[in-house]
């Protein structure tokens, strides 16, 4: 009897623990950068010019709510998308080749992914962080309008000649009222 009670208690504890670590309950989410002591800390992710940024003041996107400064994302079958109510998706790709060095970008509609790039491999981990192929992301300062450019970890600490890049946790935050946007190419 004691063993049965112990097993039931352990099972309940494991279930409660797993529930606390699950991915967002909503399909749509925003992302903020986490790196304590850095200017990128708590900066929201946005999309512009076929790239992903943190802390960009203006996305110059065509949105239902144009004053919002962050992008809305969703994952489907391991692929990451920018949310739009239209039937024309904008899908994220990653180029981890020697040329791409972890470049994260997006294509629109039927555009093919660039050579050497990957679309699948996105997931939200038990800490509620977005990762690509099980790795956290990288943020590099001094991009357009003072924003941070966002890169996948391809084993290059400062990709594409950037300097002072930092590893970040890309924290996922539920969005209950997604902002439909078409982002600039």
Curated annotation (Swiss-Prot):
Highest taxon of the lineage: Eukaryota
Location(s) in or outside the cell: Secreted; Secreted, Cell wall
Any one of the GO CC terms: extracellular region
GO biological process: sporulation resulting in formation of a cellular spore
Regions that span the bilayer: none
Glycosylation sites: 60
Secretion signal, residue range per the UniProt entry: 1-18
Keywords associated with the record: Allergen, Cell wall, Glycoprotein, Secreted, Signal, Sporulation
Primary location recorded for the protein, binned into one broad class: secreted
Family: Belongs to the phiA family.
Name of the molecule in the record: Cell wall protein phiA
Organism: Aspergillus fumigatus
Gene this protein is translated from: phiA
């Amino acid at each position: 009897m004691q063993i049965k009670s112990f097993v039931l208690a352990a099972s309940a504890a494991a279930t409660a623990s797993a529930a606390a670590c699950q991915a967002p309950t909503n399909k749509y989410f925003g992302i903020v950068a986490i790196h304590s002591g850095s200017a990128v800390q708590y900066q929201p992710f946005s999309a512009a010019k076929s790239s992903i940024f943190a802390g960009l003041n203006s996305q110059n996107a065509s949105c239902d709510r144009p004053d919002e400064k962050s992008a809305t994302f969703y994952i489907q079958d391991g692929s990451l998308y920018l949310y739009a109510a239209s039937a024309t998706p904008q899908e994220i790709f990653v180029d981890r080749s020697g040329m791409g060095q972890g470049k994260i970008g997006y294509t629109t509609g039927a555009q093919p992914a660039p050579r050497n790039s990957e679309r699948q491999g996105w997931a939200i981990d038990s800490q509620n962080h977005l990762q690509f192929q099980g790795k956290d992301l990288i943020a590099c300062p001094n991009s357009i309008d003072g924003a941070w450019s966002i890169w996948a970890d391809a084993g290059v600490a400062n990709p594409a000649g950037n300097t002072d890049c930092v590893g970040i946790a890309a924290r996922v935050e539920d969005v209950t009222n997604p902002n439909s946007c078409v982002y600039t190419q």
